[in-house]
């Protein structure tokens, strides 16, 4: 009896030791893999490591997916916001090298795609990458690009809207998003659907460029006869994600932010940031050695919006019409005139008669204190229902207008619309406070 009891106790002890060993083994494995998937934040050295943490991944619903060595975001509610060089971007995808493709959250301008051209020869590609005498490129507006930006692969496959592939790529510093990538993210049910019209990088067999409609569907009616439509431009760039100078969590309220040291002069700040000047909030358009170009962040107000007709003709002038109001009435209402510089503003023509060539837009200019924006300027879509200074060759009684959803139309001079001024100021004005956002603009001292 005692012998049986002894054997029983030994078996119980063996079982206990076995169970204890299993708990230790599998518990340690669980801790090991948990640490791999969820490293301490202080162990995360680079932006790409933080973004691709295991806890951020999903295989259903909204979130970050990982397939075939590519990470990509899908769905509406995703924390993929990134702030760089004064612009808010969304992270689209990450490749196996740690390169992160970004797209601007907002439209950066609106323009005609091109004149029966492939993306690589289009006006949009030129505006994205190449400076001219008529306009500064989107690339020109970015700071601290050295060592951060890498070339972007833009998918340029021809598509009929049903068979959508991404086999043919064009390499440039700045590109556009493809229909393929738009669909991969969830199309109209994704974070990429911002309720505006904007170009993709693809064309159909008839030479029509595809664009995203305001409801999120993809369309290709980009022209009618000899008339070509202007839609919004959302540039894509690719950054090296193996950087350590960052902060943030990727939410809209606390985006990932790439951090660089900046000076205190106005021209040390980023294009796209906001400044309070003469009690008006302005957005920085250009930062140059000799001047900084600003555009009001909204139409001029006196409690309500001040509305005005363009004038008796579409030539912009300080002597009559909207130009006279801006350079006399509005200018004289400003307290700090000493900081304003004379500026050269384009008042050129843009339509089918010159094949919508944006480089022709500086064939007529006007020098004055206060001007209007033109097609191809940054952030022209921030405000709706106002006049641009861009004319047409076909009629002296028409002028371009910015309407809703990122669309540009040729309108009548006699319509009453908002007034959105632009001006040049001294570059060495000092920043004393503010964070440069629209709600907390920089203040000058």
Map each language-model feature to its residues:
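Hydrophobic alpha-helical membrane-insertion segments, chiefly the h-region
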Residues: 18-30
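N-terminal Sec-pathway targeting helices
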Residues: 2-18
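Collagenous Gly-X-Y triple-helix signature in extracellular proteins
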Residues: 27-445
